[in-house]
Regions:
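Short, well-ordered secondary-structure micro-motifs
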Residues: 11-14, 73-74, 102
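Catalytic histidine neighborhood in serine/cysteine hydrolases
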Residues: 80-100, 111
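Catalytic active-site module of serine/aspartate enzymes centered on a nucleophile-bearing elbow/loop
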Residues: 103-122
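Short alpha-helix in the alpha/beta-hydrolase fold that links the catalytic acid
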Residues: 49, 58, 72-81
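Short beta-strand/loop motif that positions the catalytic acidic residue
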Residues: 55-57, 62-64, 68
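Hydrolase active-site cap/lid region
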Residues: 3-45, 51-52, 91
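Acidic catalytic loop of the alpha/beta-hydrolase fold
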Residues: 66-71, 98-99
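Histidine-centered divalent metal-coordination motifs
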Residues: 4, 64, 97
Length: 122
């Protein structure tokens, strides 16, 4: 199950800069990405859920709040489309970041339960 996940650190940083500063990222994101590469061994572009989900072979339930102000909901559609496994998508109207279960508990838990039941032998 993936909830409110970004496609990559690079995409998330771009979205945050756009929201906070109107989109002018200048050298900030590339500089921090380079610092990450030096210190941790990977750049923001390499820290990519999008690249990882393409290799996933297990079933994935994607859940995202449509009113997520932190991670744009559009990212879940890119992740869903990139997944080459059995998958299901649930977007929750009015739900902010990681609030899908709180905003629509019946919808959320029904989706989780039915998804899990598809893969559990009874």
């Amino acid at each position: 199950c993936i909830r409110d996940s970004y496609t990559s650190v690079w995409d998330q940083a771009k979205a945050a800069v756009k929201d906070l500063y109107g989109g002018a990222m200048g050298v900030f994101i590339p500089a921090v990405s380079l610092a990450s590469k030096v210190k941790f061994g990977y750049s923001f572009r390499e820290a990519s859920a999008l690249n990882q989900i393409r290799r996933c072979k297990i079933p994935v339930l994607f859940i995202h709040g449509e009113a997520d102000a932190l991670v744009p909901c559009a990212m879940v559609y890119r992740l869903y489309e990139a997944a080459n496994c059995d998958k299901q998508l649930l977007t929750v109207p009015g739900a902010g970041h990681c609030l899908s279960a709180s905003v629509a508990p019946k919808l959320y838990w029904s989706a989780v339960r039915s998804f899990i039941e598809r893969y559990i032998d009874r």
